[in-house]
Amino acid sequence: MPDSALPPCSILLLAGGRGQRMGGRDKGLIEWQGLPLIAHLHRLVRPLTDDLIVSCNRNQERYAAYADRVVSDDSRDFPGPLAGIRAGLAVARHPWLLVLPCDAPRIDRALLETLLQAAGRTPARPWMLRCGGQWEPLFSLIPTHLAEEIEHAWRQGDRSPRHVLLPLGAEAIELAAGDPRLANLNTPELLANHRELK
């Protein structure tokens, strides 16, 4: 059951990319430390929500084992993570949508709780992690009431989550440059380098 001390949130795991850096392989299903990457994220976030959403454009039946709902965006050309965020916002059942990439298995519960606790301070604005001054929009917490504004930006042709969220008054959780919890294991080399790390 979700922690009642934290604001109720839906959680979206983004697994919809082409996997170009992985030679076209579906990143979320690649194994790391004996489990698919998506399984590590599922194990971490499952206690935080009763509305776990996975956005993917292929292998939906396999991802269904790790989600309450599987969604896909409405384009066939892999238009990027904002498409998955739109799909998640469209079905989210709670006032907040916590967005995470499927290829970041080193993120920890403490950091997610910090992000969720921040929501109570400014409930109308999105929150993002900012690592060494660099915004990380795929580690974000978005009020679902902003879905219409995000949809408007999409219709105007904006495909960048950062460009869309910043004008909505995004707040930052500051992290030091190189924080290993945000490591995206999105190439074979990175996957190998982090394979033995706990």
UniProtKB/Swiss-Prot annotation:
CDD domains (alphabetical): MobA
Residue numbers binding Mg(2+): D103
Keywords, comma-separated and alphabetical: Cytoplasm, GTP-binding, Magnesium, Metal-binding, Molybdenum cofactor biosynthesis, Nucleotide-binding, Transferase
Localization of this protein: Cytoplasm
Broad class of where this protein is predominantly found: cytoplasm
The protein's Enzyme Commission number: 2.7.7.77
Catalysed reactions, semicolon-separated: Mo-molybdopterin + GTP + H(+) = Mo-molybdopterin guanine dinucleotide + diphosphate
Leader peptide range in chain numbering: none
BP terms from Gene Ontology: bis(molybdopterin guanine dinucleotide)molybdenum biosynthetic process
SUPFAM superfamilies assigned to the protein according to its UniProt record, in alphabetical order: Nucleotide-diphospho-sugar transferases
Binding locations of GTP: L14, A15, G16, K27, D73, D103
GO terms for MF: GTP binding; metal ion binding; molybdenum cofactor guanylyltransferase activity; nucleotidyltransferase activity
Named cofactor requirement(s): Mg(2+)
Its biological purpose: Transfers a GMP moiety from GTP to Mo-molybdopterin (Mo-MPT) cofactor (Moco or molybdenum cofactor) to form Mo-molybdopterin guanine dinucleotide (Mo-MGD) cofactor.
Assembly behavior: Monomer.
Domain notes: The N-terminal domain determines nucleotide recognition and specific binding, while the C-terminal domain determines the specific binding to the target protein.
Family: Belongs to the MobA family.
HAMAP family: MobA
Protein name per the record: Molybdenum cofactor guanylyltransferase
Organism of origin: Pseudomonas aeruginosa (strain ATCC 15692 / DSM 22644 / CIP 104116 / JCM 14847 / LMG 12228 / 1C / PRS 101 / PAO1)
Gene: mobA
